[in-house]
Swiss-Prot record:
Keywords: Cytoplasm, Ribosome biogenesis, RNA-binding, rRNA-binding. InterPro entries: DarP, DarP_sf. It is found in: Cytoplasm. One of its GO terms (molecular function) is ribosome binding. Disulfide bonds: none annotated. SUPFAM superfamilies: PSPTO4464-like. Member of a network of 50S ribosomal subunit biogenesis factors which assembles along the 30S-50S interface, preventing incorrect 23S rRNA structures from forming. Promotes peptidyl transferase center (PTC) maturation. GO terms for cellular component: cytosol. PANTHER family: UPF0307 PROTEIN YJGA (PTHR38101:SF1). The gene is darP. It holds the Pfam family DarP. This is Dual-action ribosomal maturation protein DarP. Belongs to the DarP family. Its main location: cytoplasm.
Length: 183
């Protein structure tokens, strides 16, 4: 029996591979299928959009052509076209597409949130007066200070006289116009 040197364990083939740098991420076949199915559903959502909504989503020319073709096709051909769109989406970064689609879906919710913020700002304008006017001017520099102050004065008079809040509504409309012009 021959005696092996002390460092014979260091010479094992394949031992020199660094495990930290070359970490392999194993993905199951079912996870790949779930991801593919989800991208196919995303493609179907995009196909169901109208032309105006489709223009707001960042799509390259090939994908746009495939989507427009799927909108014209019916029945079994449509299913195959949706699979093709899902395959095309797997080869692209879909995050900007998802964000644009979410923005389209949540437009109503965003408007409701904006209206609540504008209502709160209107109420602060009526209660605080000039301090809140400065905040409005910092948000929207093109706002008319004189018109805003006039509306606030009228709203305070209406509130004290228990009259309908006509000026308060006008303040809200003015703030909404400022917010819409900003977009």
């Amino acid at each position: 029996m021959t005696k092996q040197p002390e460092d014979w364990l260091d010479d094992v083939p394949g031992d020199d591979i660094e495990d930290e740098d070359d970490e392999i991420i194993w993905v199951s076949k079912s996870e790949i299928k779930r991801d593919a199915e989800e991208l196919k559903r995303l493609g179907a959502e995009i196909v169901d959009l109208g032309k105006n909504a489709l223009d707001k989503i960042p799509l390259d020319a090939d994908l746009r052509a495939a989507i427009e073709l799927a909108q014209r096709i019916k029945m079994e051909g449509r299913r195959r076209q949706l699979q093709l769109i899902g395959k095309m989406l797997r080869q692209r970064d879909v995050e900007p597409i998802r964000q644009a689609l979410d923005k389209l879906k949540n437009r109503h919710n965003q408007q409701v949130v904006l209206f609540h913020k504008l209502e709160q700002l209107r109420d602060r304008l009526i209660v605080e007066g000039d301090d809140a006017v400065e905040e409005v001017l910092s948000l929207w520099p093109n706002a008319d200070r004189q018109q805003l102050r006039s509306l606030i004065r009228n709203a305070k008079k209406e509130k004290e006289g228990n009259k309908p809040p006509k000026s308060a509504r006008q303040i809200f409309q003015y703030l909404r116009e400022l917010a819409e012009n900003e977009e």
